[in-house]
């Protein structure tokens, strides 16, 4: 099947084209709505690139240029030649709890729950509508970040607020990074030569946004992110878990509005708020130069991560493996070392030489004597979206 995967942002469209599960092209439309917009399409098979720089006013114009570049490259005759298009959607809300083919109801529901993800869902919706207009005969599939966590039990996803807030306003823990957690846990099963229904793993997706997921027999039973992607770990610019009483205190102290506090927690906090950097390469360079705030930021990040992983050891009946994925999880050997050292009493024994090796691809970095496997698995959310899209189209 010929599958296009779209990840539409407010001013960008990222895309990958798969032909029979093989990536043939990838690219980006950036700076939509600006005069110096740019479209890049790369032929993955021969590294040939095709580019256009021009004014792109909206997503529709951007996708039209992508179609032109597909034709110019010879990779795809036309968007109408696709078998399907998979769209990454951050939030499905309470009703869209599973990946699904797009119809009028799905469009309306994605729009309705945009209040939960105002920075993401409206852009995703624009991407779907643009694709429907550009290629009316092509099936569109909505792939929700929240869907993998639909198997969490109610006692894990509920907040201890008056029940009406859940019943009438859908306030509950949803979880995110679901596509990534699903992909790497499935790959872990292959790596360990087990069926995923027999495997219990803890997946740590560590990037500028970060979350941990407890996966029992292939299903999410708990995760660190909640109603929004702000809850949980200390992140690049997000604070993670916080005493809620701090918010009105800060509001009175600084005279900040709810919107300003929201911006503070999402964009000015995390490791960035502590030391002024959110790139871990910069943080570790600063630590080497004696920057105490950088050291504190890294220690806070790792400590919170250890607490969550440790708590999921308690949640799972048995833990077979810990998975590190995402930009930090895949590339930062120091973070992996600091986390695993603090978890040694739970049966985790890291092989320090394997951990330090700069190797891309899936690998096991635990010592042979370790009771729990430690895996580094590069995530591939686009491949997972393409797989699910193909599966749903095949069923229908």
Curated annotation (Swiss-Prot):
GO cellular component, one term: cytoplasm
The protein's role, per its UniProt record: Catalyzes the formation of acetyl phosphate from acetate and ATP. Can also catalyze the reverse reaction.
Record EC number: 2.7.2.1
The protein, known as: Acetate kinase
Residues reported to bind substrate: 88
Domain of life from the UniProt record: Bacteria
GO-annotated biological processes: acetate metabolic process; acetyl-CoA biosynthetic process
Family: Belongs to the acetokinase family.
Primary residence: cytoplasm
Gene that produces this protein: ackA
Catalytic residues in the record: 145 (proton donor/acceptor)
Cofactor note: Mg(2+). Can also accept Mn(2+).
PANTHER family: ACETATE KINASE, ACETATE KINASE-RELATED
Required co-factors: Mg(2+); Mn(2+)
CDD domains in the record: ASKHA_NBD_AcK_PK
Amino-acid positions noted as binding ATP in the UniProt annotation, renumbered to this chain: 14, 205-209, 279-281, 327-331
Biological pathway: Metabolic intermediate biosynthesis; acetyl-CoA biosynthesis; acetyl-CoA from acetate: step 1/2
Reactions the enzyme catalyzes: acetate + ATP = acetyl phosphate + ADP
HAMAP family per record: Acetate_kinase (MF_00020)
Gene Ontology molecular functions: acetate kinase activity; ATP binding; magnesium ion binding
Residues at which Mg(2+) binds: 7, 381
Subunit structure: Homodimer.
Keywords: ATP-binding, Cytoplasm, Kinase, Magnesium, Metal-binding, Nucleotide-binding, Transferase
Alphabetical list of InterPro entries matching this protein: Ac/propionate_kinase, Aliphatic_acid_kin_short-chain, Aliphatic_acid_kinase_CS, ATPase_NBD
Annotated source species: Campylobacter jejuni subsp. jejuni serotype O:23/36 (strain 81-176)
Top-level EC class: transferase
Site (Transition state stabilizer): 177, 238
């Amino acid at each position: 099947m010929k599958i296009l995967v779209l990840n539409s942002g407010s001013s960008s469209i990222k895309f990958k084209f798969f032909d029979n599960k093989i990536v043939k092209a990838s690219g980006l439309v950036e700076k939509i709505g600006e005069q110096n917009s740019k479209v890049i399409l790369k032929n993955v098979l021969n590294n040939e690139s095709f580019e256009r720089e021009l004014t792109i006013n909206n997503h529709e114009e951007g996708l039209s240029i992508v179609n032109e570049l597909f034709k110019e490259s010879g990779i795809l005759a036309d968007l109408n030649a696709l078998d399907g298009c998979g769209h990454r959607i951050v939030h499905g809300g309470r009703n869209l709890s599973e990946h699904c083919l797009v119809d009028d109801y799905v469009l309306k529901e994605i729009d309705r729950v945009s209040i939960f993800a105002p920075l993401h869902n409206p852009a995703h919706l624009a991407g779907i509508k643009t694709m429907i207009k550009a290629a009316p005969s092509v099936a569109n599939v909505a792939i929700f970040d929240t869907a993998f966590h639909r198997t969490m039990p109610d006692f894990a996803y509920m907040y201890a607020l008056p029940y009406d807030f859940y019943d009438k306003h859908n306030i509950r823990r949803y979880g995110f990074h679901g596509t990534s957690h699903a992909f790497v846990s499935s790959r872990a099963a292959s790596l360990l030569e087990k069926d995923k229904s027999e495997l219990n793993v803890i997946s740590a997706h560590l990037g500028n946004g970060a979350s941990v997921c407890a996966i029992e027999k292939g299903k999410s039973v708990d995760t660190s992110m909640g109603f929004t992607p702000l809850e949980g770990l200390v992140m690049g610019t997000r604070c993670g878990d916080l005493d809620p009483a701090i918010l009105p205190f800060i509001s009175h102290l600084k005279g900040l509005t709810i919107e300003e506090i929201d911006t503070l927690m999402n964009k000015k906090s995390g490791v960035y708020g502590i030391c002024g950097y959110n790139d871990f390469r910069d943080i570790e360079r600063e630590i080497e130069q004696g920057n105490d705030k950088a050291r504190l930021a890294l220690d806070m990040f790792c400590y919170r991560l250890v607490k969550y992983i440790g708590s999921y050891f308690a949640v799972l009946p048995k833990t077979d493996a810990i998975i590190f994925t995402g930009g930090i999880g895949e590339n930062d050997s120091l973070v992996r070392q600091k986390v695993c050292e603090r978890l040694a009493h739970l049966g985790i024994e890291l092989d320090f030489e394997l951990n330090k090796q700069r190797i891309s691809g899936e690998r096991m970095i635990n010592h042979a004597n370790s009771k729990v496997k430690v895996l580094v698995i590069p995530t591939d959310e686009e491949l997972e979206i393409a797989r699910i899209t193909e599966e749903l189209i095949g069923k229908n």
